[in-house]
C-alpha cells in the first residue's frame, strides 16, 4: 500500500505551499523538497507571521488582497508557474477551502493537507484532498487491521520505531509569540488578512 507521501513525491513536480503550522515547518519543507527531492516549490504568505518565517524571494510571494479575489489570484499563479500540487496545513482555513475547490475543478491538480497526527505521538498526518472530517481514508476498523497486517507480513518486520521528538513548550511558545507579534506588526501590509478562526466561506 503506497503512502500519500510517496504518491505526492512521485506525482508532483511543481508545488505551491499555502499556510503551514505556526513557525518554520513549511520553510524546512520547502528546502527539503527543493534540495533533496528536486522539486520546484513556491510559497504564498497571507500575513506577517507567514512572511517572517518565509521571507519574500523569487519563490515566495505575499497575497494581500481580499479573500474574494483569492481564487482569481490562485488561478493566475498556478498557470504562470505551472503548479501541479498545492500543499497546506489544515483544510478548514478559508484560503485552503478555496484552493481545494479550485483543485477539484482542475483535472491535473492535486491538493495535499498536513494535520497534527491522529493516533500516534511524534507523527504528523499527510493526506490527499482533506483531513479529519474531509479525510478520504476508510473508517472501517477491519480494513485498517488487514492493511497493517499485510504490510507487516510483506515487509517481514515490525513497523519502524518512532524517533521521539522532545516536548519543548518554551521553544514552541517563543515561535508562536513571534508569529503573532509579526501578524500585528505587519498588519498594515496585509490589510485584508483575517485569522482562520475568524473567517468562514459565505
Please identify what each model-predicted range represents.
Residues 23-27, 46-144:
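Active-site and donor-binding regions of nucleotide-sugar-utilizing enzymes
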Residues 109-201:
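Active-site-proximal region of nucleotide-activated glycan assembly enzymes
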Residues 6-10, 80, 178:
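Polar/charged alpha-helical tracts
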Residues 1-47:
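N-terminal subdomain of nucleotide-sugar transferases
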Residues 8-9, 16-18, 29, 33, ...:
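Generic detector of leucine side chains in alpha-helical contexts
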Amino acid at each position: 500500500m503506497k503512502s500519500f507521501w510517496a504518491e505526492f513525491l512521485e506525482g508532483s513536480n511543481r508545488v505551491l505551499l499555502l499556510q503551514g503550522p505556526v513557525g518554520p515547518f513549511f520553510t524546512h519543507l520547502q528546502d527539503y523538497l527543493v534540495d533533496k527531492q528536486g522539486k520546484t516549490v513556491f510559497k504564498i504568505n497571507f500575513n506577517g507571521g507567514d512572511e517572517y518565517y518565509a521571507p519574500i524571494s523569487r519563490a515566495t510571494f505575499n497575497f494581500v488582497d481580499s479573500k474574494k479575489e483569492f481564487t482569481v489570484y490562485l488561478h493566475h499563479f498556478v498557470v504562470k508557474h505551472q503548479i501541479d500540487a498545492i500543499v497546506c496545513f489544515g483544510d478548514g482555513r478559508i484560503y485552503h477551502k478555496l484552493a481545494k475547490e479550485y483543485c477539484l475543478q482542475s483535472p491535473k491538480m492535486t491538493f495535499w493537507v498536513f494535520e497534527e497526527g491522529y493516533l500516534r505521538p511524534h507523527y504528523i498526518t499527510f493526506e490527499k484532498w482533506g483531513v479529519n472530517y474531509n479525510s478520504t481514508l476508510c473508517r472501517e476498523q477491519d480494513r485498517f487491521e488487514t492493511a497493517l497486517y499485510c504490510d507487516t507480513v510483506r515487509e517481514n518486520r515490525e513497523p519502524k520505531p518512532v524517533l521521539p521528538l522532545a516536548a519543548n513548550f518554551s521553544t514552541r511558545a517563543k515561535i508562536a509569540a513571534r508569529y503573532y507579534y509579526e501578524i500585528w506588526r505587519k498588519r498594515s501590509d496585509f490589510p485584508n488578512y483575517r485569522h482562520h478562526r475568524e473567517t468562514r466561506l459565505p
